[in-house]
Every structure is written in C-alpha cells, then in structure tokens.
C-alpha cells in the first residue's frame, strides 16, 4: 500500500514532517555570492530554503506528470501534490519542452535519446542517486550493463556535484542560463535514502531581496551543504516547493508552476 500523509505529523510553522517512515526538515538560510553563510538577509545575499528528506523505502520518491506524456498542458504543483498524496512536492526537469534526454518516471520509460551535452540524473530502485556526465549512448548502456537500476531519470541538468567533486566546468551547448544569477532548484543526496533539496531565491523575490546563483555558485552552494551528488533540476522564476499542499518558498514571488 502507498504511504499516506498523516495530518498530525506536520511540524508547526511549515517546518517539516515526521512519522515512522519519513522525516522532512525545512530550514532557511542566507548566503553571499562568495558562498558564505550569514545570519540575516542583506545587500548581496540570496535566501536558500533547504529541505532535508530522509525516507525508509525507495518507493516514497515518486514522480508525476501534469498530463499524460507528451502533453504540454500544465497543472499547479499544489494540485498535483494533493492528487498524488504527497507530503512534499517540487517541480522540475522541463523535459516536455524539448525532445532529447533520457526520461523515466516511476520505472516507466518515456524517452531514451541520450545527448552528450546533457547530464542525466538517476534515482535507482534502492533510493540511490547517480549522475551521468555527458550522457552518450555508450555511458547509458554501461550504467545498465553494470547492474544499474532505474526508478526515475531527469535530463534538465547539469550535474553540479558528482561523487563528491564540485563541478567548475559546464557544457556551453546547454541553454540553462549558466552565467545568469537566478532561482535554482537543486536536488542532492548525502547518502542513499537521504536527500537535500536546495531552493535558492532569485531576483524576482522582493522580501527579502535575493540575487540568485549562476551554475558555478549553485555548485559551490551544493558543496557547502555537503552533498555527494547534486543536480540542477529547474531554475528561472518557477521553482516551487509544496508542503502539505501549500507553496512554502518565495512568498513574495507570485510566479509558480
């Protein structure tokens, strides 16, 4: 049976959730462009919402589509969260707006068109996270032939931290606003079954104001949080974090997905 949220297990002040199978903790912090943590927001800082997620069963990570593939119709994340009985939900990947990359959702293959300038993030069936940098057909086959399993894959990218190494070079053929300080949705892992989502605010946020991070800043930030693997899952101004069917990030930014 799927795990269902217990309404009594949400923490006060949108602080997270805790039951026997799931632990979620939400923390807000403020960072400079040099990736130094400061006590309060101010000139030149960026607000970062960190969501720590610890699961006990790999099937607790689920993906959902707004409409059946390949429809481009959209649904707000809050509604999708409610439809899918999600304690926590985030948006990302944007894969429907191009025709490349490897896309699996809940073990079902939707697309398998590897491109060497796209990094692939994999959540395996054991709750582990892997990133294939520059996903050629051969690298994808190698992963599968070496016993790699697939529950979900994502192709927005790029990888920011791979096996503990913070990236400092990114493929210029990818149009993910590499040099633009922006809102970023970073999905990362510390150990299997233990994930961290970093939602950084961008220039659209007014209260408090934020600058946002370019890809290099996002990678350094992920490293500062101790992530072993981290992936740029979304960005721009549409990053949405939903807890208990309510959007909890960037309250002063009206945009949402």
What kind of feature is each model-predicted range?
Residues 1-257:
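Gly/Ser/Thr/Pro-rich low-complexity, intrinsically disordered segments
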């Amino acid at each position: 049976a799927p795990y269902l949220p217990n309404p009594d297990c949400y923490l006060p002040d949108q602080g997270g959730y805790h039951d026997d199978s799931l632990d979620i903790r939400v923390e807000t912090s403020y960072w400079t462009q040099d990736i130094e943590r400061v006590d309060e927001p101010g000139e030149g800082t960026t607000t970062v919402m960190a969501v720590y997620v610890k699961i006990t069963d790999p099937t607790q990570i689920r993906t959902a589509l707004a409409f059946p593939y390949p429809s481009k119709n959209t649904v707000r994340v809050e509604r999708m969260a409610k439809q899918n009985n999600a304690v926590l939900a985030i948006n990302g990947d944007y894969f429907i707006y191009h025709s490349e990359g490897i896309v699996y959702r809940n073990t079902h293959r939707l697309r398998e068109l590897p491109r060497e300038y796209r990094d692939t993030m994999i959540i395996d069936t054991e709750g582990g996270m892997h990133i294939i940098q520059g996903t050629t057909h051969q690298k994808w086959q190698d992963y599968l032939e070496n016993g790699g399993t697939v529950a979900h894959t994502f192709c927005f990218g790029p990888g920011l931290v791979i096996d503990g190494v913070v990236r400092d070079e990114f493929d210029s053929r990818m149009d993910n606003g590499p040099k633009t300080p922006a809102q970023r949705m970073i999905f990362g892992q510390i150990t299997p079954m233990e994930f961290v989502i970093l939602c950084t605010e961008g220039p659209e946020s007014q209260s408090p104001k934020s600058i946002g991070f370019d890809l290099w800043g996002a990678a350094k930030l992920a490293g500062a949080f101790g992530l072993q693997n981290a992936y740029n899952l979304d960005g721009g101004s549409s990053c949405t974090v939903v807890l208990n069917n309510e959007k909890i990030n960037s309250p002063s930014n009206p945009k949402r997905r």
